[in-house]
């Protein structure tokens, strides 16, 4: 294929139907003693629930209302703030947003989470409260025809991959469309992997007023 390069082409490389995913390292800047105490408070709250758990495998908090707990107030405000910035970045026009669910996940050695989506929500996210980068989150291209023809790759890039993984780096947040299929790889660490997950729904008019399939949330 090298002979192709002798021609001078003018190309406009347009990436259509984007799947927008956001990775935020150092999501909670632990600079001051106060910020560190916030993180420690969230860890203690989850650890206390973990000690009194009713089951042992792939543990999650029983209720998904951590955003209503005082220990998660600062974290919740951070999630709302960055979610509003994302929606503004994507040029959506909404009245407001709301967290519908927030819960904690604890994965022990050899545990994993199977493929799933987060139905009836617009954005979803996960934050790694405690992790040594084992048990990455993995996203899969949901388009059924995307793997019909897959040429061999010179290099693996965002442009030619149908599966992408992101390490569960401590203090990292990953925010993605709720419809995007994802799973969590097996935890091969001897330490527990603690994450906080949440869902975001938009408020306001969905669709255009002249469309029959519009709605007002």
Where are the language model's segments positioned?
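Short beta-strand His + acidic residue motifs that chelate non-heme Fe in jelly-roll/DSBH
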Residues: 113-116, 182-189
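Active-site region of the double-stranded beta-helix
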Residues: 70-100, 108-122, 129-135
């Amino acid at each position: 294929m090298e002979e192709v390069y002798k021609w001078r082409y003018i190309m406009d490389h347009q990436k259509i139907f984007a799947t927008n995913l956001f990775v935020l390292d150092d999501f909670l800047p632990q600079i001051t003693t106060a910020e560190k105490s916030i993180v420690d408070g969230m860890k203690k709250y989850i650890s206390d629930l973990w000690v009194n758990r009713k089951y042992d495998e792939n543990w999650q908090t029983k209720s998904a209302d951590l955003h209503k707990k005082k220990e998660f107030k600062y974290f919740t405000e951070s999630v709302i703030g960055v979610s509003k910035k994302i929606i503004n970045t994507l040029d959506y026009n909404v009245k407001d947003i709301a967290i519908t669910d927030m819960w904690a996940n604890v994965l022990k050695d050899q545990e994993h989470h199977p493929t799933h989506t987060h139905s009836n929500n617009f954005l979803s996210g996960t934050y790694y409260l405690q992790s040594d980068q084992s048990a990455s989150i993995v996203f899969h291209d949901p388009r059924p025809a995307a793997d019909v023809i897959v040429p061999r790759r010179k290099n693996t890039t965002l442009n030619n991959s149908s599966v992408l993984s992101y390490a569960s780096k401590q203090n990292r947040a990953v925010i993605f469309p709720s419809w995007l299929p994802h799973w969590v790889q097996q935890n091969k660490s001897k330490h527990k992997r603690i994450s906080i997950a949440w869902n975001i729904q938009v408020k306001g008019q969905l669709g255009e007023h002249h469309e029959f399939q519009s709605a007002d949330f």
